[in-house]
Structure formats: C-alpha cells, structure tokens
C-alpha cells in the first residue's frame, strides 16, 4: 500500500525544522539507550587487543618501531561504528512500520523526504557521538603505550563522516524496501557478509606465494576477485574507510577529496532510492 503524504505546503524552513526535530529525537533515544555505549565499549576493546598484540610483537621481535601502530586499531573501531549506524538505520523505518507506529508520524505535517532526511541526520549525529566516545579513549591508550598518533590520521576522521553518510543512506534504503524488520536484518547481514567474504578471499589469494603449485591454477579467480575488489573501492564503505585513512595518513588529500565526492554521490543515490522505496512500500505493516 502506498503512503499518503501530507498535503500541507512546505517551505525549506519548515522542512528543515521538521528534519531537525526528528533527528534530535532519534539521537536522544540513542544517547539515552545502552546499545551505543555497548558498541563503543566493544570498539575500544578491539582496539586495546590490537594495540596489545602490537606491543607483544615488538617485545618478541626486538623491533624498536612498528609501522602505522595505531592505524589498524582506529580502522577496526571505525568499522564497528559504521556497522552500528548501518544497523540502526536499517531498523529506523522497518521496526516502527512493523509495530504500526510509523503511520502515526504522518498525522503530523511531514512527508517522506522529511522523514528520511530526519533519520539520515540522526544517523550522522549518532556517528559523531560514537567518535566522541571512542577517540578520547584511544588517545589515552596511545599516551599510555607511547604510540604516536599522526595528526593526519586524526584529520582523516573528518571525511569518514561522509562515508558514514553512505552507510546510513544504504541502511535506510533496506529499511524502506524490506517487508519486515527481520528481513531487513537478514538483508543487511547478507550484504555485509558478501563484502567481507570477497575482500577476505582476495587477500587470501594474494598471500599465496608464486612457488605454490596452485598459484597458476587460481590466476583467473585472482584476477576476477581483483576486479571486484577494485569496484568495491568505489562502493564499499569499509574499503573506502581503509583508503581514506591511508590517504590521510600519507597526506594525499586529493585522493581523500575524490572519495568524499564519491561518497556524496552514493549518499544522494541511496537517499533518493529510500524515498522511492518508501513511497512504493508504504507505512503499513
């Protein structure tokens, strides 16, 4: 059943005020809940484990330095942040629609673009809150372990907000298009697993030495997955996160700006797809 949108005329000021109200309410619910803090604690725990492994490696190998010691812990923490906000966005529409609460919102003077925009802005606010929770702890961890955190890596946190926008918009599209909250979760998990399996399989194939007897036999598969990996660098948020942080670390800001532009285009595409899907799917369970 398609949704019936409000016929009240909107101007840009009214739309923006409505988007802000929805975003503040959603962000407030996340701030007062427990899932945000649990996800942040897990992200910090993963970073601590990775830092501990680096320290242990230095002690056992006798090395005095480690290349990019804080890159992997920060990348892992931010990847978990992206997973969290994507899951939140994926349930933002599907869950209240399944509960019958979504249709109540349309008694207020809002329409579908305003609702999607409010959920999108809320996701960005939650991501920034996530950063504010984990980054100070990671800096304290770096100070305790005497690991240097390059300034470029910290500046690289700013463009990750645009990458977060892609994941939020994609999550909203799944939420708007899926028939139920359960199917939303299944679709999201399937998409994430496909991305991780492709990247993991390609990394495993690259680790096979040329002297291995299966090296030539796997050439076609290696080239095929390499092509997909190249495509993922333009569409996968996790791959984009890796490239953005690496580019920021070496000071290649032109590459960062290119990826930010790609992220903005992807965000606009998925937001438009979310509005279309919600108009097709409607607000009723």
Please name every model-derived segment.
Residues 41-43, 184-195:
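Central hydrophobic cores of alpha-helical transmembrane segments
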């Amino acid at each position: 059943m398609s949704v019936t949108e409000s016929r009240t005329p909107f101007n840009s000021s009214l739309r923006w005020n409505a988007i802000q109200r929805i975003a503040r309410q959603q962000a407030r619910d996340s701030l007062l809940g427990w899932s945000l803090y649990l996800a942040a604690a897990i992200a910090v725990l993963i970073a601590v484990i990775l830092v501990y492994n680096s320290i242990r490696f230095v002690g056992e190998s006798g090395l005095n330095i480690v290349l990019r010691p804080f890159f992997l812990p920060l990348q892992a923490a931010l990847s978990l942040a992206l997973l969290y906000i994507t899951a939140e966005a994926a349930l933002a529409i599907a869950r209240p629609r399944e509960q019958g609460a979504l249709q109540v919102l349309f008694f207020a003077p809002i329409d579908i673009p305003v609702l999607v925009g409010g959920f999108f802005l809320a996701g960005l606010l939650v991501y920034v809150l996530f950063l504010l929770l984990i980054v100070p702890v990671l800096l304290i961890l770096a100070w305790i372990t005497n690991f240097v955190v390059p300034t470029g890596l910290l500046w690289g946190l700013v463009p990750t907000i645009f990458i977060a926008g892609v994941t939020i918009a994609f999550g909203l599209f799944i939420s708007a298009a899926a028939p139920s909250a359960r199917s939303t979760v299944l679709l999201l998990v399937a998409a994430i697993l496909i991305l991780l399996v492709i990247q993991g399989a390609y990394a495993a194939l690259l680790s096979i030495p040329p002297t291995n007897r299966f090296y030539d036999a796997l050439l076609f598969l290696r080239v095929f997955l390499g092509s997909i990996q190249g495509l993922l660098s333009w569409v996968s948020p996790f791959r984009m996160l890796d490239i953005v942080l690496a580019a920021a670390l070496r000071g290649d800001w032109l590459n960062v700006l290119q990826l930010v532009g790609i992220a903005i285009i992807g965000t606009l595409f998925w937001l438009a797809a979310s509005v279309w899907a919600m108009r097709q799917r409607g607000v009723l369970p």
